[in-house]
UniProtKB/Swiss-Prot annotation:
Formation of pseudouridine at positions 38, 39 and 40 in the anticodon stem and loop of transfer RNAs. It is an enzyme of class 5 (isomerase). HAMAP family: TruA. Its EC number is 5.4.99.12. The keyword Lipoprotein does not apply. It comes from the Bacteria. The lineage of its organism: Bacteria, Pseudomonadati, Bacteroidota, Bacteroidia, Bacteroidales. It comes from Azobacteroides pseudotrichonymphae genomovar. CFP2. The keyword DNA repair does not apply. GO terms for molecular function: RNA binding; tRNA pseudouridine(38-40) synthase activity. Substrate binds at Y110. Gene3D superfamilies: Pseudouridine synthase I, catalytic domain, C-terminal subdomain, Pseudouridine synthase I, catalytic domain, N-terminal subdomain. This is tRNA pseudouridine synthase A.
Amino acid sequence: MNRYFIYLAYNGRNYCGWQIQPNGITVQQRIQQCLSILLRKSVTIIGAGRTDAGVHANLMTAHFDWEEILSTTSLTKRLNGILPCDILIYKIIPVKKNAHARFDAISRKYKYYITYQKNPFRNEQLFRLKQPLNKHLMNEASNILSEYSDFTSFCKLHSNTRTNVCRISKAEWNTVQGIDIFTIKADRFLRNMVRSIVGTMIDIGKNKLSITDFRKIIESKNHIMLKSSVPAHALFLTDIEYPNWIFKN
């Protein structure tokens, strides 16, 4: 059996997230359907994570198994040919047989985009606010995140997860061409975690919460303490890293 990694991107606007579910079309479902058509046999793909409904991905990965050696260049071209225009396959590559798209990922990176101006061309990808935020305070809050590992407070209730421990290696706010961008990198993320963190930091940027309040929310390990979240449409999964050993020479 041969294992292959798929590198892809998608606009999440028309999908109920990544993972297959009974009530709605998902990205995983679309790719599996098209891949199964091309290979003329049912194929199951395993993603590196589960983005929520409306969340986009500049880079997502998934793996699948196939008995024969595939022409990955040809398969990539053919798959792009029948997938809808809001899903793009960058490449398909062979990997080691025990490589896993989800469990072997070293890190994942997300970005959230905020604007203060009307933008008719990017309304679906930017969260618009009326007044500029205090990025100095928000970056102060960002620096605090790496001091903690239990992010229960930012996890959606009733999430099916064994642990709420995440190791955040980067969190910062930057402004590029008038757009505020929050970048966060960690070994893993909880459901709704990034959107909850951003929503709470916006409250800090509006002087509705203090840095002390932010610490209290984290240390409470209680989702009830959380007051704010942000819409999914401005959130992007932008990178996933893997150890070199999973790739074939």
